[in-house]
A protein has these predicted regions:
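GIY-YIG nuclease catalytic motif and its immediate N-terminal context
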Residues: 1-39, 53-84, 95-96
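A short N-terminal helical cap/helix-turn-helix that marks the beginning
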Residues: 88-94
Length: 96
């Protein structure tokens, strides 16, 4: 049976939408790796979406984190509705 490695799931709302996307949901092994991972996203390293968002000059910020594994991250992505989970969007009345 596969072991589910617990880590940190994070939600990044974009300053403005990129095509259909207004958020990115990601995962890291532990909170220790979160800030370096965000730095990598800012540098355009890693997820293709974050690379093109950066190339388009679109900023982002960390809105929320959850404890969880890769399976939970994938489930959240499949469910959609990142703007409903995003405290920044809810506060601003913004919908992706």
């Amino acid at each position: 049976m596969a072991t589910h490695v617990q880590g940190v799931i994070y939600l990044l709302p974009f300053d403005r939408p990129y095509r259909h996307a207004s958020h990115y949901t990601g995962w890291v092994h532990s909170a220790t790796f979160l800030q370096p991972r965000l730095g990598a996203h800012r540098d355009g390293v890693g997820a293709r979406l974050m690379q093109v968002v950066g190339e388009a000059g679109i900023g982002f910020q960390l809105a929320r984190t959850w404890d969880g594994d890769r399976y939970r991250e994938r489930a959240l992505k499949r469910q959609g509705g990142a703007s409903r989970r995003c405290p920044i969007c809810r506060q601003q009345g913004r919908r992706g």
